[in-house]
Amino acid sequence: LDFNVNYEYSDQGGYPYFYTGKVNEEERKEDTRKDKIGLISYNDESSYYRSLLNASVNIEYQAQNFILSAVTGYQHLKDRMFLDQDFTEKDIFNLEQKQKLNTISEEIVFKSKPGRRWQWATGAFGFYQWLHTSGPVLFKRQGVEEMIEDKANENFPNSPMAPSMKMTINNETLNIGGSFDTPSLSGAIYHQSTFNDLFVKGLSATVGLRLDYEKTSMKYRSISEPIDFDFSISMQRPLLNLSDQHMKAPSTFIGKLSNDYLQLLPKFALQYEWKKGNSVYATVSRGYRSGGYNIQMFSDLAQTEFQRNMMYAVKESEKIDDPQYGAMIDKMIDGMIPEAVDVKAATSYKPEYSWNYEAGAHLTLLESRLWADLAAFYMDTRDQQVAKFSENGFGRITINAGKSRSYGAEAAIRAAITNAL
């Protein structure tokens, strides 16, 4: 019986990122922030606090012909991250993210005694995680202007023949709320058998199979402060001058998503050991990494929803309705309304699957004074999960990148020159 507990606490500053300049050589010449290269130039303090508790109990029973073990684990995490998310001296936006996590796991393994010709192991694994994340994003005045107001005005036609349109946002700050519950449940049963001295002495074969089930879900509640904005449209010929003030555009996302995954993961291996410490081997196995949700995307989704609702507010305004040109204005506005937000498509990423192949050798040479390990591997991955920056350029998200192949070789050599060295 083993019982382990450990606790960690930290409260510190964080995220000392600095500006490295433009990537393109031509753009470097016109870089307006040259004086900030190599400098940390935040205007908001960044910090990180964490409280972490881990506990585990390991129980093992050894019978005459088998070993039974059970491992129970528990983890509690509470943290807070405050981040100047634009990483510059500008007053654009910041993030305060708090997490509270509780995880419990159990694994029971029933296996044979070592040294037997048939070595086997059968087990079951269960895991449940509760995770609540609060991550409101605060857009300050400069962020409201550059990331919402300017983007909205960029969508308006810029032609002498088209009406002149302008949108002005009156909010000094804009708070985009974010509250997320993302629990996950996982369970697995598995068996692996190794047959030693199969057909000839030194040849062993391993066959394993794991049935894995996982359920992930996300309950989201992102309610943002409504945008207060003014809008005007004007033309010289024919004369047209319409405007409305203090219109409102909300952004609200409330809902729940869930996904279930059931996978069979086989494993096959052959090894031939002709002398102790000298062997060749080959393995084939299927790998799996579960999918999940990008809660960081909700600030991007809120910006799109704001633009949609601002355009709808303009379209429904009685002050911007003209008897002669109303149909033309409505048609123009319809062409500038972004597509409706699909929360599931925008925030979900799929599981990653792979087939893994490896062959190699372990060699003991020169009367056990030289050891060499050689290996070659190949991985065929589908729906590979990769990290990328979000569309607004701030924060990272996980996406699926289709398929990829990885291959390579490794070599390691160790030597004992003398008995003491």
Regions from the PLM with identified roles:
Residues 1-121, 127-133:
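Outer-membrane beta-barrel domain signature, strongest for Gram-negative TonB-dependent receptors
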Residues 15-40, 86-94, 136-177, 217-258, ...:
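Solvent-exposed loop segments that connect transmembrane elements
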Residues 7-11, 63, 74-78, 126-130, ...:
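Transmembrane beta-strands of outer-membrane beta-barrel pores
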Residues 63-64, 113-117, 198-200, 275-277, ...:
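Outer-membrane beta-barrel channels and translocator barrels
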Residues 50-54, 58, 101-109, 184-190, ...:
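Transmembrane beta-barrel architecture of outer-membrane proteins
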Residues 58, 62-63, 67-83, 279-281, ...:
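Membrane-embedded beta-barrel scaffold of Gram-negative outer-membrane proteins
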